Swiss-Prot record:
The gene is PF20. InterPro entries: G-protein_beta_WD-40_rep, WD-F-box_domain-protein, WD40/YVTN_repeat-like_dom_sf, WD40_repeat_CS, WD40_repeat_dom_sf, WD40_rpt. WD repeats lie at residues 324-354, 366-396, 408-438, 450-480, 492-522, 534-564, 576-606. It is found in: Cell projection, Cilium, Flagellum. This is Flagellar WD repeat-containing protein Pf20. Pfam families: WD40. GO terms for cellular component: motile cilium. Inter-microtubule bridges in flagella.
Amino acid sequence: MAAAGLDTLRLEDSDDDFKYEEVDVMSDGEDDASEDLDAALRKLQQFTSKQEAATGPARTTEVKPGQVVKKPEVIDDFLRNFFIKMGLSRTCECFEAEWYELKATGRLDNSTTVPDVYLRNAELEDDVAGLRRELAEAKSIAGRASATWDKFRKERDFHRMHHKRVAQEKNKLLTDLRRLKEHYAKYEPTILELKKKYETLMKEKMMMSLERDKLAARVDALEQVASSPLPGAERSLGGQSTAAAGGGASGRALGATNRALTGDVPPAAGAAAAAATGRSGAVSAGPRSGWASLNAPPRRNPYADLEFPAAPVKMLSLNKTFKGHLLSVANLALHPTKPILVTASDDKTWKMWHMPGGDLIMCGEGHKDWVAGVDFHPAGTCLASGGGDSAVKIWDFEKQRCVTTFTDHKQAIWSVRFHHLGEVVASGSLDHTVRLWDLPAGKCRMALRGHVDSVNDLAWQPFSSSLATASSDKTVSVWDARAGLCTQTYYGHQNSCNGVSFNILGTQLASTDADGVVKLWDTRMTAEVATINTGKHPANKSCFDRSGQVLAVACDDGKVKAYSTTDGVLQAELAGHEDAVQAVLFDPAGQYLVSCGSDNTFRLWS
C-alpha cells in the first residue's frame, strides 16, 4: 500500500511535464461517422465476452414475468452466516481479511454457490418434522377410531343377539297364531250356524210382530162390526169384506195388504194402461174389474189437527255409524210404525236394519244392477225397490222373497213410492216417464209422460192421489194419478232437480237441484214461498220433520244441513260423512235423524 502511494505522488508531480497531443474534433467526428453497425456489434460482443470471462458463465434461463426464482447462496455469504450463527466473530474477521486480500490481488477464483444439498436437507428436516406431527395426529385419530369401532362392534353384537331373540319370539308368535287360527277354524261353522239361527229368529220375530198387528187389526174390526147396529146377514160376511165395510181407512188398508201378501190377485180385465201423449193429455185406463181404485172418497189427513214441536236439530250429534254395504248407499226408507230402516245400495242389494241398534234383519238380493229407490208399504208388510236394471220389485216379508217384478221401464229407475192405500206403486225413470203399477192386477196402470228429461224423484202428497215429480228438465210437476193429468208445473230451478218432498200436511213442497238451491212451494197457492242456497255443492234429497218447521237437506259436500221453513235460516250443519250425502230422513217419532252417503255408510244423529 505504501508503494502504491509513492507511485501516485510521483505521477501527480510529473503532470506538468506531460505532453498532451492535440486531437482535432472534426477528425474524431469523421471516425465516428465511418463506423458501421457491424463494427458496433463486434465491439459489443467483445465486451460481453470479456465480462463473461471475468464473472463466469451467466445464466441464460429466462424468468417469466411474475415468476419467483430462488437463487442459491454464494459460498462466502454461507461461511459468514455460519460463523456468525456459531458465534465465531474473530474467525469471521480473519476469514474476511484473507478473503478480500486474495480477491484484491486476483488470486481468488470466481465465487461459487453453496451446493443445494444443504438447503434441501433443511427442507427435508422441516418436512420430516411436519410428517412426524401428522403421524402423531393420525395415531391419535386411529386410536379414537379404534375405540369407536370397538364400541360399534359391541353394539352390533348386542343388536345381533337382540335380533336373534326377536326372530325366535316372532317364530313362536307365528306358531301360536297358527294354532289359534286352527282353533278358531273349528268354531267357525258353529258361529255361522248361530248367526243363521239368529237371523232366522229375528225374521220370525218380525213376522210374528206383523202377524200380531194384523190379528189385532182384525180383532178391532170385528169388535166394531159386532158393536155396530147392522143386520145379521151383513155381520156374517168374511173378515176382509167386514173390515172394508166397517173398519174405515184401516180396514181398507188391511184388505189391500191381505190381497198383496196372499197373492190373491184377480185376473186383469183388460190390457195395460194406455200411454200418455203429453202432460195434459195422459190417458188413464180407468177403474176396471180386478184393478185397484184411486177414486175412493178423499181421506182426511189425521195430522191436520195435531201440532208437533220442531225437531231439535241444534242438539243433534253423530251417535252411530253403520257400514253395512260394499258400495255407496243411495237411499233410505223408514217403516211406518216400527223402528226399522231399509237402505238401498249400489252393491245391488237392499238391507233391513233394526234401529237404533243397527242389527241386520234381512237382506234383499235380486236386482242385476244398483238399487236406487226403496219404499215401505203403508202397512209395513212389503217393500218396493227399483234400480239400474229397469225393474221394480215387490218383496213380501212373510214369504221372504220377491213376489212381483215389473219391467216396463226402458231405462234405470231412480225412485219408487207407495200410494197411501198401498195398492199402487209409482216409479220415476231415466226414460222420462213415471209409471203407476197396480199391485192387485200385477200390471202397469198408466204411464205419465211430459218430462223431457230423467225423472229423478217423486213423492205422493199425504193422503191424496196427487203425485209430485222432480226432473232433470229443471221443473217440478204435480200429477193427478186418477186422471193421469199434470195439474201444476213449478218453474224456477236453473239446473237439474234432484229431489222432491212434502211436509206431513201436504201444504208445502220442497225441491232440490244440482246448484245447491232448495225451493219451497205452497201447494194451495201454487207459488214459490222461499229459496234457500245451501252452497256451491249439489243438494240431493230433502226431508221435512213432523212439525213441518225444519227441512233437512243432504248435500254433496258430505254435510246434512237443517233450515227453518219459515225464514230459510240455517239452524244446524251436521258434518260426519266422508263423501257426498245421498239421502236423509227424520224419524216419524222425532227421536233421531238418519243419513246415508257415498262413503258406504249410513249414520244415526240423535
